């Protein structure tokens, strides 16, 4: 999406900051940027929220893990060690909310700020993870990962483009917003979290 926009408008300089949800919300409160892409916008702010891409969170394991190919309950997940995104990330927020509502507590072995690091550690057998399907690419099995069949998953939380309701968007920001909302959605590929 960004690449096609930059090709269409080569004179527009883009500044892109990738951060976790906590930092993005702070930047949003301080009105530091034109637009924000996030999966879990805050509910306590007056925002314009425009979903533009479906986003599913799935449970992943190493391809040879004993749970691959079985239907699992959420309670069975409580027996596993998990590698999750750090507290403050949108992914972690969504996962924690879902597990709390389900009455299940996950054993978090390691919290990381990188989806790539989590993928690599899961494929090496260090534990399971919950990741956005976009973070897995088109063929997770090529990276030694399997998507598990777990009750209550996938968790669906769309990616949205967000700005303060009273924000007057610059012409370049409005052009990018229009491009984003009118483009064909990508089926895979990493997005910021």
Language-model regions, residue ranges each:
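A late-sequence structural motif
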Residues: 146-189
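Ligand-binding clefts/hinges and TM-proximal coupling segments of bilobed small-molecule sensing domains
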Residues: 88-104, 171-174, 178-193
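Central regulatory/effector-binding core of bacterial HTH transcription factors
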Residues: 1-45, 105, 112-114
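Hydrophobic residues within well-ordered alpha-helices
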Residues: 28-29, 77, 120-126, 161
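Short beta-strand->loop
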Residues: 48-58, 133, 142-156
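A ligand-binding cleft/hinge motif common to bilobed small-molecule-binding domains
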Residues: 22, 37-46, 97, 101, ...
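Residues embedded in well-ordered beta-strands
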Residues: 35, 51, 58-60, 81, ...
